[in-house]
């Protein structure tokens, strides 16, 4: 469990660093008064979407690595492909949690950390969108 927690925290830190860098880039791409408001918001939103998709890649890689270390497996799939890991990470990070693929053993710890990470990053994104739209209205 300590190994899984350490991996989960490492993935959280990598994801947070990536997402904050992408938010800074989105702010540079969408400063007030430089381009039409809708274009700025669209460009910034695309970068934020890319950030969330890359965070899913980070966690998918972490899930695959942790599974290869024997920290658990995924039920409902005889063998996980790269797409399965990405799909599971994306569903987990967005906190949708469909349940068609689910982790066993210590991978559940990493899954919980992935969900918390996604919730935190979605909150950061909501703040970015709110501030961007608020600047456009003023």
Please tell me what each predicted stretch does.
Residues 10-15, 83-137:
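Pore domain of cation channels
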Residues 19-23, 55-59, 63, 122-126:
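Alpha-helical transmembrane segments of polytopic integral membrane proteins
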Residues 28-40, 69-73, 138:
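Membrane interface segments of multi-pass transport proteins and intramembrane proteases
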Residues 42-56:
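Interfacial helix-start motif at the membrane-water boundary
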